[in-house]
Amino acid sequence: ALRQAADNAGELQAVLDRYDDERRELAEYAVAATWGRVARTGAGMDSVEALYRELPGIYKWQFDSAQLARGRRYAAMPLSVTKDAATVTADYLADNIDDAWRLWKGRQWNRELPQDLMCEMLLPYRVGDEPLTRWRKPYREWLAKLEDTLARCGNSVEAARIIVDRMGLCHYNDRLSTPHRSALDLLEAPIGYCREDCDRVLYAMRSMGVPVAVDRMLLSPDNGGSHQWNVVWDNMDRRMRMFDNENYPPTRDSLYYDRRRKGKIYRSTFAPDLDRLARYRKAVGVPPMLLNPWLRDVTAEYFGHNRAEVAIWPGAKASEENAVYLGVFAGQRFQPVDIASLKGDRAVFTDMEPNLIYAPVMADGKICGYPFMLRHDGSLHSFVPDKGSYEKVTLTRKFTPGYHQKSRFSSVVGVHVQSAPTARGPWTDLDVIDTPPAHSYRRINPDNPLTGRYLRVYADTMCKGKYGAEISMLLACRDTLGLDCLPLSVVGDDAARERYTRILLPDYSLE
């Protein structure tokens, strides 16, 4: 870090020289952690922040079409990259070290928190590549009314729950791809997706002395996307407790499960995990996400240690350079989430979620062995096709509906679909959705021929979804297969026509 600091090396050295007590080790850790850390800033990000502050609008916390176009233009603007080691000041690091030290020594629940965990869960001055800010005091002032309650609290999980109850939601909006937002921007405008929600939780918890981190899956076996959540160190049994600020509050309930299949789980770290990176040292063409130095494999904390040894097809020509990876099915193919060690013509995988189908793959995702499942009892089942026996099946769904999918399905409960001869009515129910649909579509076959020219979709009470009823498309067809569609137009003012035409009519074009 001192070499990377160049002309700023004096600032980093000043931090080290400031301490001659236990804080010296924290200072060494913080200085070392500046290695490779950067902030990404620019006029485009400033404009994105201004855009977030225009919400909520008529679409609640979602952008309208004009805002989204602006946001994507801003997000594509060039960014400036500044290295922490070359720019951070001694005062900034020292203030962070002193504050984290005070909370480590002062909170009841931190009395047995090991120093290595303290350095990763209380000490960090940053989360990702956000602009650096002095965030600890503003967050503590925001949560100041909780201080007396927290002072009496002896359990870190309970302290986390108290803070979560005060924080409220981070309003969901995942339409823009940007660097991490700054701590103060998240405090002022809590908007984003799971990343922003987790970042905001980290700042709040650490400002009050609660040891927390972020765990993540790089690729979801359920939907192919990534996801992250928070964990809090439980001082009662010295283990991590996962929680989701919005849906699953911190709890010591050992039966807690968020219903997501995960495959492999990594923890975001403050200092780089060089031991994990060493496994990829000789491999060629490693997927970039696996070379993130600030990830640590913590799958065993969730599922225990396990091991699977599978045969590799001879044609794969596997070697340390042409490495084999653990593949989870995501995005219509198996994709790498961890590297294997080779044992002759076999690949050895360790620490994975049981009862999930994996496949050995090469760096490009090409399968190099039969898919397999490691069961809870440690037994291994390989899916070897029997070409002498065939059976036809009808596949309607690869996975059971996940949390978000169930939420979207249930959002339409209470919706009426009606017809009328005029735009003013009288309206007649064609269908009332009283239970969540089993699929992402609903087909309505009227008992009698329709005589009304107008259709209306509405809910007489607020639907259960975050944004009301979530309906993406509306078709009126002459046939039952949805091939012979009738032309539709939207009745209403300009705003209604703009919004609902985009959402409901599949042939609508912006051009």
What does each model-found stretch correspond to?
Residues 3, 7-189:
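Secondary-structure boundary elements
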Residues 278-306:
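Beta-strand-rich domain onsets/edges
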Residues 321-340, 417-419:
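Short amphipathic beta-strand segments in non-cytosolic proteins
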Residues 345-366:
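Short Pro-Gly-centered beta-turn/loop motif in secreted/extracellular proteins
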Residues 390-511:
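Aromatic, loop-rich ligand-recognition surfaces of beta-strand-rich domains
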